[in-house]
A protein has these predicted regions:
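Short beta-strand segments
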Residues: 19-55, 69-72, 82
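Short, basic/aromatic recognition patches
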Residues: 1-23
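An amphipathic, aromatic/His-enriched active-site/gating alpha helix that lines ligand/cofactor pockets
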Residues: 31, 66, 109
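Charged, gly/pro-rich active-site loop segments
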Residues: 1-7, 77-137
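Generic structural signal for secondary-structure transition and capping sites
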Residues: 20-21, 68, 107, 125
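A generic local structural motif
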Residues: 8-11, 35-37, 56, 105
Length: 137
């Protein structure tokens, strides 16, 4: 089901703040998907997803080469995919902000002097976060 990323229902917002891992999909230079487990944060004011990683990671290199990205969070029957163009941010202030958000959702990230932020400007949301009723079927 497609959702309006600017007006996510309360159940979707709650799902995005619960402590879950997700997958991040980017494209390799040859066009094949690269899918890895990640922790991420959602910024509803700016409609962006942030993932922290090392500058030398494959996902960071894919994004630096100009990749769209998708984060998909799944828990039981509930799921959300957040898609959009992705850019690599290395400004120290951006990295600190992303680390702070990550720590609030998960835990304090370990020190990493090569840390960068992958920022997805969400332009499409797909998902199911409220269990369909038995009569809807």
């Amino acid at each position: 089901m497609s959702l309006d990323s600017l007006a996510l229902p309360p159940a979707a917002l709650a799902f995005l703040t619960d402590r879950h891992l997700a997958t991040l999909t980017t494209l390799r230079p040859d066009g094949t998907p690269h899918v890895v487990p990640v922790g991420f944060t959602w910024d509803g004011e700016r409609t962006v997803v942030r993932v922290i990683t090392s500058r030398s990671s494959r996902k960071a290199r894919n994004v630096a080469a100009g990749s769209r990205a998708v984060v998909c969070q799944l828990q039981g029957w509930a799921w959300l995919s957040l898609e959009g163009p992705c850019r690599l941010r290395s400004d120290r202030g951006d990295v600190r902000d992303a680390e702070r958000r990550y720590a609030a959702r998960y835990r304090e990230p370990r020190p990493n002097p090569e840390r960068v932020v992958l920022e997805i400007a969400v332009d499409r949301v797909l998902g199911l976060v409220e269990r369909p009723s038995a009569s809807s079927g």
